[in-house]
Regions:
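C-terminal capping/extension of enzyme domains
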Residues: 135-173
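A structural signal for short, hydrophobic/glycine-enriched beta-strand patches
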Residues: 1-151
Length: 173
């Protein structure tokens, strides 16, 4: 059994870039459940990220019963911790052997490292499935200001998470 964890981040554009990819993965039978995660308010939708993503996922054809909603998290760390608690509450963690993370490439390393820490004792494989936008693709992030700013911000967050002991230190090669 596989679970897909999709987090929105700070933008309501996740339904444009990440959600279609998550839907494709689901419809191809690679995952049986989707967790949408995020508690930040989306002004244009007048709701929090996860609730908005759930509505969009249903519009895209995901069965309501296959969507779990984590709508309290304000950080990536909280996304993972609260999603794990949601899986435990719904008796899914023991059944699940793979957790696929859908987020952008620039955010993937930290997301995977946090997921590996949070799910460390649960016997699951963490898989990355980057859902891309145009400014932060692995091959283009450095060609535009938005991509460079996001990449630098992500490095700063990784350093902060290492200092706080939330992820393990590692060598950049």
């Amino acid at each position: 059994e596989s679970m897909l964890h999709m987090r929105n981040g700070r933008s309501s554009k996740a339904h444009i870039y990440r959600l279609p990819y998550a839907v494709e993965v689901y419809k191809n039978g690679l995952v049986s459940k989707i967790i949408v995660s995020g508690g930040r308010n989306i002004g244009n939708a007048n709701m929090v990220e996860a609730d908005y993503l759930k509505e969009k996922a249903i519009e895209f054809g995901i069965k309501k019963k296959d969507i779990l909603v984590e709508n309290k998290a304000m950080t990536t760390w909280e996304n993972m911790k609260l999603s794990r608690e949601l899986m435990i509450k719904n008796n899914l963690l023991g059944e699940c052997t793979n957790i696929a993370i859908v987020t952008s490439s620039f955010h993937m390393r930290r997301s995977i490292m946090i997921a590996e820490r949070v799910f460390r004792d649960d016997g699951v494989n963490i898989v990355s499935l980057p859902g891309e936008d145009n400014s932060t693709r692995r091959t283009t992030w450095f060609t535009n200001e938005k991509g460079r700013v996001r990449a630098i911000g992500e490095v700063e967050k990784i350093i902060d998470y290492v200092k706080k002991g939330k992820i393990d230190d590692f060598e950049i090669i």
